[in-house]
Amino acid sequence: LFRLGVMIQMTWPGAPTITYGDEAGLCGWTDPDNRRTYPWGREDNELIEFHRQLIRIHKDYQVFKTGSIMFLKGQYKLIGYGRFDENDKIVVMINSSDEVREADIPVWRMGIIQETRMARLMLSDREGYSDEAKVYPVVNGLIHVECPPMSGMIIKDIESMG
């Protein structure tokens, strides 16, 4: 769930803020034990790299800083929202359930035309994360996605990937 929260934070409107040590897997409890010493030499390197990749995506696309937001899908433990502007159209899907969830996402609401294709920039699930692209064709203004259990995906229109 932590990585899903980070994905939302890096794609939601506003400036994302990381609390000291979160990127390394630092745990804390209630005050005064809410922040411990940084775990030098014991960092969660996979989690650090996950943060780096999401920060890179956030920096690479102006839409995350100044674009609009629109809810595209809302079901029990499954949400999808779009971030869009005149240059980029991006879908973020979050599945917090223990089951695979499938959904048709109405990308036409962000102005995506039927012949457009979209590609996944990142997938995060129980196994870790991947930036391996997967292409989603837009059919009748929709993309069909299959979200693994406890997963998040960032999907972007290919025409503006540059």
Predicted regions and their residues:
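Carbohydrate-interacting/catalytic domains
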Residues: F2-G5, T11-I18, D22-G162
